Amino acid sequence: MPVVYGKDTPKLGFGLMRLPKRGFVIDVEQVKTMADLFLEAGFTYFDTAYVYPGSETAIRKALVERHPRDSFTLATKLFAMAAPTETAARKQFVTSLERTGAGYFDYYLLHALMENNYQRYEKLHLWDFVREQKEKGLIRNLGFSFHAGPELLDKLLTEHPEVDFVQLQINYADWENPKVSSRANYETARKHGKLITVMEPVKGGNLANPPRK
């Protein structure tokens, strides 16, 4: 996992995309228990996103309002495809700050870059915007999550050397999968000297229950 101002981040993150619910509402009390246990085990990295329904608000209640700000690291994401205009895209950042109450983001990602959408991040001038927020101290580490092949990854990292880290889908089942390109993307990020965070390490839970045959 990345390094925050010289402090090694323990190598396990808490993904906040799918949180427990009571009916149709996130069970914040259960999330509090989960967050507390995660911190007690020595881990610190929490990962949410603007487009995860209710997640940013839940993590404010379960984590930010209950623990010292320097006891955890928080990542969230901006998704250009959920923004019809540049103004709307920038508003996502402000809204994420308000929802989480975090004051700043230890990690901030442009969300889910792939072949059919990466140009929209350029069109909406979002690379410039997130650089500005980092200069203001509202972002500590800047990155993007990625869902494509090594050619596009190489292009993006060449054009945006300011990136501190990249989030990749990596697991042993997809290491040589041409549709995921775990190995090739990992090697490309390393070639550029970028730190890597991993998503889908157990492939959506499938690797926790592999088929018997």
Model region roles, listed by residue range:
Residues 1-72, 129, 135:
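N-terminal binding-site loop/beta-alpha segment at the start of enzyme catalytic domains
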Residues 9, 43, 102-105, 139, ...:
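A structural motif
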Residues 14, 38, 46, 59, ...:
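Conserved, mostly hydrophobic/aromatic
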Residues 17-29, 77-88, 115-119, 213:
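Active-site mouth loops of central-metabolism enzymes
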Residues 24-39, 85-101, 148-158:
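Short, acidic/polar
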Residues 70-82, 108-113, 169:
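A short, structured active-site edge motif that brings together acidic residues
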Residues 97-118:
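Active-site groove signature of glycoside hydrolases
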Residues 113-213:
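Beta/alpha (TIM)-barrel catalytic core signal, keyed to glycine-rich beta->alpha loops juxtaposed to Asp/Glu
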